Amino acid sequence: MRKTLLLILFFCLGVQVWAQFPKAIFPGDYPDPSILRDGKNYYMTHSPFYYAPGFLIWHSTDLIHWEPVCRALPEYEGSAMAPDLLKYQGRYYIYYPTSTGENFVIYADNIRGPWSKPVKLDVKGIDPGHVVGEDGKRYLFTNNGWITPLSDDGLKVTGKSRKVYDGWEYPANWVTEGKDMYLESPKLLYKDGYYYMMSAEGGTAGPATSHMCVVARSKSVFGPWENSPYNPIVHTYSASENWWSKGHGTLVDDVNGNWWVVYHAYANGYH
């Protein structure tokens, strides 16, 4: 039996504060969270996989109590996963891949809908993460450190992809899903002159200690990317911990300037 939960952890771009956190906010099967702060409101969605309608969007004003507001993907379009929910120039977007190996985007002028039909993007990879570069152009990161340029409306690819990040090399003796780093889930933000990218490594469904969240920063979306000396920011070090396979996180700031990371995990023994 698998029991995936979403958890929240207080985070300070380098220093973790562990008081009453981490705290489970979504007990149940809600993997691959993506969270957005829009003024005093927070919105979040997650992987629907084979469920339709998909991309259930949740709303909160305190990051702890949530209520559903809409489903952004009304019809089944293949197993949809690992979304990136964002707002850019007044419009909301969800970028996501499917089991077909393709990437799509949907958009809406109101987060409660109506949402557009999926627009196919000519980009390979999984777990897309949107960012606006230092040149004012829009880009999409995908797994394994690749970046692809987008059109101004964010609905088309305008150039070739290139690799700009190699990930954080975790210790060779750590027990993870396999020999591959499984560098995925790039989620980006810009703060005080730096781009920060939180990524997942180690594999999602491997041993209890496999998954993790790592952070790198750069002055440019094209790098060089400097890995945090505090990596991994989130990780299960032992199968004796309450939460297994913690990872796939998204950073978000609250209205008071505090920073948090929302990520998924398995309850101990329910993997």
PLM features: residue spans?
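Short glycine/proline-enriched turn or capping motifs at secondary-structure junctions
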Residues: 2-3, 271
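Sec-dependent N-terminal signal peptides
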Residues: 3-13
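Carbohydrate-active catalytic/glycan-binding domains of CAZyme proteins
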Residues: 19-271
